[in-house]
Amino acid sequence: MTVGKSSKMLQHIDYRMRCILQDGRIFIGTFKAFDKHMNLILCDCDEFRKIKPKNSKQAEREEKRVLGLVLLRGENLVSMTVEGPPPKDTGIARVPLAGAAGGPGIGRAAGRGIPAGVPMPQAPAGLAGPVRGVGGPSQQVMTPQGRGTVAAAAAAATASIAGAPTQYPPGRGGPPPPMGRGAPPPGMMGPPPGMRPPMGPPMGLPPGRGTPMGMPPPGMRPPPPGMRGLL
C-alpha cells in the first residue's frame, strides 16, 4: 500500500498513542510503524486491563503491566487516540559543534601498538641496514660481534698461502735449513776444497740406463771399464 505524505498515520509517528482492543485491553506506547493491515508497532508500551471482582460489593480494579516493544494485530484493533506528544531525545549523544565550549578533557585519537613516549628499539651494531650518506659508522663497528676470531684466522691463513713468513711456536726449533744444489745431505762429508761436486741426476730420481754416472765419492774406487755400461 502506497502511503502519501499527507496521511494521518504518518503525522502521528513517534506520538504516544492509546490503542483499544476488542477484549477491552488498552495499550499505551510510542507509535513507530504500521502497514496496510493496520498492524502496529509500539515501543515503551504499557498494558492496562480491568479486572472484575468476584463479589458485587467490590469495585473494578485496573492492572498495569510493562511490556516494552509490542506488535499489535490490526484485526484486534478497535480505536487509536493520541495520548501525548513525542518524547524528547534525552538519551542520544549528539556531536558537539565546532564553536561550542569544550570540557576539561582533551580529545585524542586512540593509539595503536607502542605508546608515543616509549623509544623505539634499535638493531645492534652490525645487524642494521646500510647507512645512507656520509658519516656512517666505520667497518670495525659494522663487523658482527663474535666473529672477529674467525676473520683473523682466515686472514692469517690467506697470508701464509700468499708467501708471508710463517711464525713457528717457540720451543720446537726453527725451520729446516735450505739445501743447495751442491750441498751434501746432513751426516755426509762434502768434497775437499778445490774440487767440483759430482754432477748427478736430481735428488729422488734414479739414474737412467746409458747415463754416465758422476764421480764416485772420495774413498771409493771407480768400477771397472767394462762395468760402466751395465749400470
From Swiss-Prot:
UniProt key word RNA-binding: yes
Pro residues: bias regions: 172-205, 214-231
Matches recorded under PANTHER family: SNRPN UPSTREAM READING FRAME PROTEIN, SNURF, SNRPN UPSTREAM READING FRAME PROTEIN-RELATED
Assembly behavior: Core component of the spliceosomal U1, U2, U4 and U5 small nuclear ribonucleoproteins (snRNPs), the building blocks of the spliceosome. Most spliceosomal snRNPs contain a common set of Sm proteins, SNRPB, SNRPD1, SNRPD2, SNRPD3, SNRPE, SNRPF and SNRPG that assemble in a heptameric protein ring on the Sm site of the small nuclear RNA to form the core snRNP. Component of the U1 snRNP. The U1 snRNP is composed of the U1 snRNA and the 7 core Sm proteins SNRPB, SNRPD1, SNRPD2, SNRPD3, SNRPE, SNRPF and SNRPG, and at least three U1 snRNP-specific proteins SNRNP70/U1-70K, SNRPA/U1-A and SNRPC/U1-C.
Region (Repeat-rich region), start-end ranges: 175-228
SMART domains xref list: Sm
Superkingdom of the organism of origin: Eukaryota
Protein role: Plays a role in pre-mRNA splicing as a core component of the spliceosomal U1, U2, U4 and U5 small nuclear ribonucleoproteins (snRNPs), the building blocks of the spliceosome. Component of both the pre-catalytic spliceosome B complex and activated spliceosome C complexes. As a component of the minor spliceosome, involved in the splicing of U12-type introns in pre-mRNAs. As part of the U7 snRNP it is involved in histone pre-mRNA 3'-end processing.
GO biological process, one term: mRNA splicing, via spliceosome
Sequence repeat residue intervals: 175-181, 191-196, 216-221, 222-228
Keyword Ubl conjugation in record: no
PTM per Swiss-Prot/TrEMBL: Methylated by PRMT5. Arg-108 and Arg-112 are dimethylated, probably to asymmetric dimethylarginine.
Disordered: region residues: 163-231
GO molecular function: histone pre-mRNA DCP binding; telomerase RNA binding; U1 snRNP binding; U2 snRNP binding
Modified residues (Dimethylated arginine): 108, 112
Subcellular localization: Cytoplasm, Cytosol; Nucleus
Modification Omega-N-methylarginine occurs at: 108, 112, 147, 172
Sequence positions bearing Asymmetric dimethylarginine: 108, 112
Family: Belongs to the snRNP SmB/SmN family.
Sm domain segment(s): 4-86
GO cellular component: cytoplasm; cytosol; histone pre-mRNA 3'end processing complex; methylosome; nucleoplasm; nucleus; SMN-Sm protein complex; telomerase holoenzyme complex
Protein name as it appears in the record: Small nuclear ribonucleoprotein-associated protein B
Alphabetized UniProt keyword annotations: Cytoplasm, Methylation, mRNA processing, mRNA splicing, Nucleus, Repeat, Ribonucleoprotein, RNA-binding, Spliceosome
